[in-house]
Amino acid sequence: GFRLQIFSASTRQAAEDARNRAKQQLSRDDIFIDFEPPYFKVRIGNFKTRKDAEKLRDTAKKQGYETPFVVETQIQTSPQ
């Protein structure tokens, strides 16, 4: 699946602060902090298609996020 990465930091606290800001600015609850040493990465969504993630990328840019980008990664899916 795909997620939108909006932030990367070397400390968990900085990533948590960014996640909290994103929750308010983008009105989403599906915001995750993924630790890929040495960085904590703030990523949004559980998108099955790149196109859906790109829609959120465009919205994030309008909200002031300068360099959001789509990443292919494992996502959480709900059972059908």
Cite the ranges covered by each PLM segment.
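Acidic/histidine-rich, surface-exposed loop or edge segments in extracytoplasmic proteins
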Residues: 1-6
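Extracytoplasmic
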Residues: 11-41, 46-80
